[in-house]
């Protein structure tokens, strides 16, 4: 049998990388891949190929294999199950030894696990469904700059979801008019307003002007309402240096929160920004622009729950997580699955919610999920019920589309939210009586009517 190791030429991966009797270690990073092999490629070979190509393997035996201990460093495909209802599709479980990964680098983790292997010829399609991050690895990350509890304490807001609004039209306003829209929304009763993800520093509105006018709006609204307000100042830029410059300026203005597009900006930039935010008391709002490029295909790419876990390690205090009810895609149980992965400390394996592994975050701070995209006041009861208190509900057109203007739109949202929270606390069923609750509130709030 030993001769197999050193025959020249192409050899089967499963001889080395398919190990069904392997007992996973507590320190292993575990991955669940949805594998669709090419016709004629057996499942064991496909699963082993994934393990090999994402760890130590190459297409043949190289003599330098003799200079290391492959048994210590190789990824192993340790379990394969057929996907029910799909022809020729399998979930392959792969265990990676911890030593394969650089400490505190989400970038390195993804380069290994979802690198070259996705272009592999023997596979028709490949999707990373879930990752189990062991405490031994997650402890090398600082995670979110502040987390849910610290954010509530900073804002002095408890017992309800937070309200946000993306300023529209997303592109084309001057800085002064943009600041005016921010002021009106915050004055009306929202907690946050938001730069759109593609608002960076364009010719019609340079970043520094926007930051200054938004800060002015913030302070004015705070003085008039007696509440702490925030505007997500988008610091995303073409270089990391420029991004940090913007974050520094936001801090100098006394802004409470900045924002980053973490997939287009990259995990390296995101982790740098998160470290700065923690050191300087800034909250960090994360937008997931580009996620659907990676996660929308059912059989290829990467599920959003993996991107969400990566973000919790890299660092962010808010992240967009779909709505379940608005204009963008998202199934309820699956969405709630990764919302729990973002917020909770310990999440049990539950395949019905798409959770393939039990995940223990060992006290890493949580991330607040943001529901955003095509939602409006009539969704409020459902959103309050689905997402609970630790969430940000973000209404863009649902605020600015109010026939009377921005401030009344904000008032309507705040009234609807307070009504839903009060009804829930009184024990009423939001799912069943939602519309009725909003209608009752509308009787004494002309903005909501």
From Swiss-Prot:
It catalyses: 2 (2R)-3-phosphoglycerate + 2 H(+) = D-ribulose 1,5-bisphosphate + CO2 + H2O; D-ribulose 1,5-bisphosphate + O2 = 2-phosphoglycolate + (2R)-3-phosphoglycerate + 2 H(+). Binds 1 Mg(2+) ion per subunit. Its EC number is 4.1.1.39. Its cofactor is Mg(2+). Pfam families: RuBisCO_large, RuBisCO_large_N. The modification N6-carboxylysine is found at residue 194. InterPro entries: RuBisCO, RuBisCo_large_chain_AS, RuBisCO_lsu_C, RuBisCO_lsu_C_sf, RuBisCO_lsu_fd_N, RuBisCO_lsu_N_sf, RuBisCO_lsuI. One of its GO terms (cellular component) is chloroplast. It is found in: Plastid, Chloroplast. Its main location: plastid. GO terms for biological process: photorespiration; reductive pentose-phosphate cycle. The modification N6,N6,N6-trimethyllysine is found at residue 7. Mg(2+) binds at residues 194, 196-197. Belongs to the RuBisCO large chain family. Type I subfamily. This is Ribulose bisphosphate carboxylase large chain. The lineage of its organism: Eukaryota, Viridiplantae, Streptophyta, Embryophyta, Tracheophyta. The gene is rbcL.
């Amino acid at each position: 049998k030993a001769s197999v190791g050193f025959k020249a030429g192409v050899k089967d991966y499963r001889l080395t990388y398919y190990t069904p009797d392997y007992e996973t270690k507590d320190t292993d990073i575990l991955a669940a891949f949805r594998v669709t092999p090419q016709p004629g490629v057996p499942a064991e070979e496909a699963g082993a190929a994934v393990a090999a190509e994402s760890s130590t393997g190459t297409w043949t035996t190289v003599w330098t294999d003799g200079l290391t201990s492959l048994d210590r460093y190789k990824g192993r495909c340790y379990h394969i199950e057929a996907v029910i209802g799909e022809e020729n599709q399998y979930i392959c479980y792969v265990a990676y030894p911890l030593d394969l990964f650089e400490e505190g680098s989400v970038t390195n983790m993804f380069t290994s696990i979802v690198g070259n292997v996705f272009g592999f010829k023997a596979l028709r399609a490949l999707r990373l469904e879930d990752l189990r991050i062991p405490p031994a690895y997650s402890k090398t990350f600082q995670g979110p700059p502040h987390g849910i509890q610290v954010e509530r304490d900073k804002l002095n807001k408890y017992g309800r979801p937070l309200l946000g609004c993306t300023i529209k039209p997303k592109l084309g306003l001057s800085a002064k008019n943009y600041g005016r829209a921010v002021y009106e929304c915050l004055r009306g009763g929202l907690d946050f307003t938001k730069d759109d993800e593609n608002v960076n520093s364009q010719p019609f509105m340079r970043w520094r002007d926007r930051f200054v006018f938004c800060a002015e709006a913030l302070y004015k609204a705070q003085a008039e309402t007696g509440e702490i307000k925030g505007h997500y100042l988008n610091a995303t830029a073409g270089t990391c240096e420029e991004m940090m410059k913007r974050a520094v300026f936001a801090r100098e203005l006394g802004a409470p929160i900045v924002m980053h597009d973490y997939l287009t900006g990259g995990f390296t930039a995101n982790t740098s920004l998160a470290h700065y935010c923690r050191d300087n008391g800034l909250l960090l709002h994360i937008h997931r622009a580009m996620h659907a490029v990676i996660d929308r295909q059912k059989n290829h790419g990467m599920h959003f729950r993996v991107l969400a876990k990566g973000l919790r390690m890299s660092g962010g205090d808010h992240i967009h997580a779909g709505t379940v009810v608005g204009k963008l895609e998202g199934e309820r149980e699956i969405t709630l699955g990764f919302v729990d992965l973002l917020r909770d400390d310990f999440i049990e394996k539950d395949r019905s919610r798409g959770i393939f592994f039990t995940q223990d975050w060992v006290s890493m701070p949580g991330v607040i999920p943001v529901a955003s995209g095509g939602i409006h006041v009539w969704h409020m009861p459902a959103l309050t019920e689905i997402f609970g208190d630790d969430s940000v509900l973000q209404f863009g057109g649902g605020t600015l589309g109010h026939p009377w203007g921005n401030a009344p739109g904000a008032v309507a949202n705040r009234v609807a939210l307070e009504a839903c929270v009060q009804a829930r606390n009184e024990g009423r069923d939001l799912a069943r009586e939602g519309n009725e609750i909003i209608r009752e509130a509308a009787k004494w709030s002309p903005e909501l009517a």
